[in-house]
């Protein structure tokens, strides 16, 4: 019989930088998970993606064991990296902070495809372009 899931914890942690300090420690401590075990495993799995924020979904079972799934980084994080900016615009409709080429948007959309609810790459690109627009980033051909 399959183990029963007691709790699902969703976090966004910088790749390779999980440690028992907040927010990781308290979230997993409440679920009774071995925090250091998770941190070591997460850091090993995400070591090659340094500098990105990785969403992770941790399933905690009755016997306090756990499994976790890492997702692709948020589109906003990938767009900021592509544009080379620290943060998006405070007033995206007035202040544009950067420009990104359409082929870079396609690259981000292809990276995000497994996690997006899109039928094809074009639909995924439109989602990423919408995120860019709301951050004050201009898309150019």
Curated annotation (Swiss-Prot):
One or more lysine residues are methylated. Keywords: Antibiotic resistance, Methylation, Ribonucleoprotein, Ribosomal protein, RNA-binding, rRNA-binding. Part of the ribosomal stalk of the 50S ribosomal subunit. Interacts with L10 and the large rRNA to form the base of the stalk. L10 forms an elongated spine to which 2 L12 dimers bind in a sequential fashion forming a pentameric L10(L12)2(L12)2 complex. In stalled/isolated 50S subunits interacts with RqcH. An unidentified mutation in this gene gives rise to thiostrepton resistance. Forms part of the ribosomal stalk which helps the ribosome interact with GTP-bound translation factors. Required to recruit RqcH, which is part of the ribosome quality control system (RQC), to stalled 50S ribosomal subunits. One of its GO terms (molecular function) is structural constituent of ribosome. This is Large ribosomal subunit protein uL11. Pfam families: Ribosomal_L11 (PF00298), Ribosomal_L11_N (PF03946). PROSITE patterns: RIBOSOMAL_L11.
């Amino acid at each position: 019989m399959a183990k029963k899931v007691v709790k699902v914890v969703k976090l966004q942690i910088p790749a390779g930088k999980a440690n028992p300090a907040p927010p990781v420690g308290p979230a997993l401590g409440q679920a009774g998970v071995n925090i250091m075990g998770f941190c070591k495993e997460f850091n090993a799995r995400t070591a090659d993606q340094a500098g990105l924020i990785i969403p992770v979904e941790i399933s905690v079972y009755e016997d306090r064991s756990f499994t976790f799934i890492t997702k692709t980084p948020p589109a906003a994080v990938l767009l900021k990296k592509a544009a080379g900016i620290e943060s998006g615009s405070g007033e995206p409709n007035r202040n544009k902070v950067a420009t990104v080429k359409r082929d870079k948007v396609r690259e981000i959309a292809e990276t995000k495809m497994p996690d997006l609810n899109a039928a094809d790459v074009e639909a995924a690109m439109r989602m990423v372009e919408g995120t860019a627009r709301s951050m004050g980033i201009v898309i150019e051909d």
